[in-house]
Amino acid sequence: IFLGDPLQLKQVSQGIHPQGTGSSVLEHLLGEAPTIPEDRGIFLERSYRMHPDVCSFISEIVYAGRLYSDDSAARRTTSSGTGIRFVPVEHEGNRTASDEEVAEIAKLIARLVQGTFTDSDGSTRQLRETDFMVVAPYNAQVRRLRAGLPEGVRVGTVDKFQGQQAPIVFFSMATSSGEDAPRNLAFLFSRDRLNVAISRAQCLAYLVCS
């Protein structure tokens, strides 16, 4: 029995291995299929984390439209709403860190924390700093975010937060342009990386970038 999600981030390997051995057993089973075929396995099609307004995007771009939200996830909301929002921030020449994005996220959190979160059981409470998760692809941006955001806000790389969740998530991309990307655009715009970052959100996800 093999369990897992090959469409999220892979384990980092420090070793050198022959070509093809970096793929998991599940990736070999999938082949070119976007999700596991019915004759090869069982696709767990229900998300207990993401509100439908978040889940529908992830389902479409990653899971071939097969993923949907459980009713309990659909009952969660914030006073600022649900879904995925794009926050453009102007900056130039940034490679792995952006003070401009840190300032914008700090401003948004200061406003959002004044609102409320309603859980799946119908209970409503004031949002607090620990209800916010800020994800970045680079350690340099993580350090800037930790220095510039309120204590209690969870900040880390995409890899660190795999498996975790929060009512509101920010994905700070930091890089100003493709020419400024220190690795390559395939890393920055990796489908698996975007999947993990956005799908941490129970209610609201903000994509913050140049």
Label each region the model flagged.
Residues 1-210:
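Conserved helicase motor core of SF1/SF2 NTP-dependent helicases
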